Structures are given as structure tokens and as C-alpha cells.
Amino acid sequence: MKIFSVTDPEFKPYGRVVTGLDTTKAEILAALANTPLPAATDYVAEDAALQELPAAVEVSEHLFGGMPCQLGWCNGHNTYLNCLEYHRDSEFNLGTEDFVLLLARQEEIAGGKLDTATVKAFRVPAGTLVEVYATTLHYAPCHVDAAKGFRVLVALPKGTNTAKPAIKNDGGDDPQLWACNKWLLAHPDSAEAKAGAYVGLVGENVHI
């Protein structure tokens, strides 16, 4: 699978590289370096050590326009797609090491299904802050170097990925709602599908 860079023009429909905020990025990277590095993949929606940084205020004000936000992380080792998710808002990522994002576009969903042949891979250099647009489907990062794994900031509006509301399926993308502000399409081979997530990915479970 070809791996593009987030600096390539192919990334433009999916997100952007955020420039500036050098002090903010340095604070976050220093704190991220002290977070766990599991053998598999782990996600924490809001990490107290990150949330208490002065950088958290900067993220809220500069990246979310003053909206309350949460700073968490996704760390570990991974080489598979497994699922794709989207939110109603952008997500911001920043890694201590190079990592790869597997991405698709919401408009590529047809009849509640997405063909994984449409997925593209983008390498994010260490220390590069990226915005992943709300219309971009994404999931856990993939590592570039198995010896280093990945430690990646996940900044989102506050409450995202917490417990979902108790709603009945009333059409639209309701069946895909897996958590608060999180709509998920799982591959049938994934652990999420076995746990009851909506199976919306068809084709190969992309592996890099």
C-alpha cells in the first residue's frame, strides 16, 4: 500500500498540517512521552496530566475556537485498519514518533457501507500537529517502527468517545453510533464487530 505524507497534496481532502503553536506542541510532546506504551493499542479520552497543561487552554482557544475540549491519547502498536470512525467535529493529532493514519472520506460511504479499497495511508512526522476533518474517517494510528510504537495526542470536543446516549434507531447513521459523538464502521474481522459494533467495512482489513 502506498503511504503518502501529510505534506503531500493528496492529504488536502482529509485534513491539514497546523503550523505555529510551537510552545504548546512542546509541552504536549513532553507529557505524552510519559504516557504508557502498551503492546497492543490503548485509548484514553481525557488524560489528567495533559488536561492540566497550560497547553490545554491553547488547544481549546486556538484549535477549537474556545470550545471545551479534551486532551487524551492513543498509544501502542498497530498495523491494521479494523474500523473507521467519524465525529461531528475535527480531531487533532500529534505524535512523539512518526505514525501512519489510515483515512477515508464520509462521502465514500454508500448504503451504510464503505469499501476499504478507498482507504489511503498518510505518514505523520513526529512533532507534526495535524487536523483531521470531521468528514474524514479515521481510527487508531499505525506504527512506523515496531520498536518505538506510537504515542499520539487525540484532542476532541469535551465528552467525545464517552457513553453514547440511549436512543432508538430512527434512521440515518443511528446504527453506527458507538459512543458519544462517535460513529463507527467496523470490519467483520475486528474485535469491535465481535463486541456488537456496526459492520460497515467491506473488503480487505487493510494492513500495512
Language-model segment annotations:
Residues M1-A126, A140-I208:
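Active-site region of the double-stranded beta-helix
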Residues T128-V130, T135-Y139:
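Histidine-centered metal-chelating micro-motifs
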